[in-house]
């Protein structure tokens, strides 16, 4: 197998140039496109695999658009597409109750832990599942926050002490798209 080490941008460009000479006709990949592939991957601790992926997806996009060149725009589009696919894959991999919590946040965006919990309990009832305890759900919110899919901020509420409000950092479309194949959730998305 290929062992991927950390490369600098120049080395990544060399690797890409080899790939291009194997799989593209001459001059099909514009220089700025090649440079952006290398720069985007070089910034990510020199990941040659990421550069190769970017180039491949950019090439597919160019082909689909019947363009005879891979341009810097194709690379930008490819980069967004790869990010979206990563988000979708990580959302799909959550267990059911985490998904229910994410749907509760989606339905009550910008809500406090308490509001999210009651929204979650309602969703559990709708899909015929027993809800977890509020303490466990609060813990789950902190765990999901670490993944970057939701963001929370502490709000001070006078005599009631403080609560945390959470909102999604991904679009609700992305959540729906990622969960649509899960049978249990089909009625509530």
Q: Language-model features: where?
A:
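Short alpha-helical segments that sit at the start of domains
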Residues: 84-102
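The conserved phosphate-sensing helix
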Residues: 44-62, 69-71
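Terminal-proximal interaction/regulatory segments of ATP-powered molecular machines
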Residues: 109-189
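Short, well-structured alpha-helical segments
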Residues: 31-38, 52-55, 134, 138
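Short acidic, glycine/proline-enriched loop segments that cap or flank alpha-helices
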Residues: 25-28, 43-49, 66, 88-92, ...
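Conserved C-terminal helix/linker of AAA+ ATPases
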Residues: 61-86
């Amino acid at each position: 197998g290929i062992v991927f080490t950390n490369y600098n941008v120049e080395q990544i460009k060399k690797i890409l140039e080899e790939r291009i000479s194997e799989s593209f006709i001459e001059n099909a990949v514009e220089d700025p496109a090649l440079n952006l592939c290398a720069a985007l991957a070089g910034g990510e601790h020199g990941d040659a695999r990421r550069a190769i992926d970017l180039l491949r997806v950019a090439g597919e996009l160019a082909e689909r658009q019947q363009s005879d060149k891979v341009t810097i725009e194709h690379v930008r589009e490819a980069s967004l597409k790869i990010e979206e696919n990563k988000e979708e894959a990580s959302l799909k991999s959550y267990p059911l109750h985490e998904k229910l919590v994410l749907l509760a946040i989606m339905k009550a965006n910008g809500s406090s832990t308490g509001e999210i919990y009651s929204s979650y309990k309602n969703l559990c009832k709708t899909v015929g599942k027993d809800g977890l305890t509020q303490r466990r759900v609060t813990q789950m919110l902190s765990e999901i926050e670490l993944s970057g899919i939701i963001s929370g901020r502490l709000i001070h509420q006078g005599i009631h002490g403080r609560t945390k409000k959470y909102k999604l950092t991904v679009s609700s479309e992305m959540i729906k798209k990622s969960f649509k194949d899960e049978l249990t959730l089909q009625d509530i998305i």
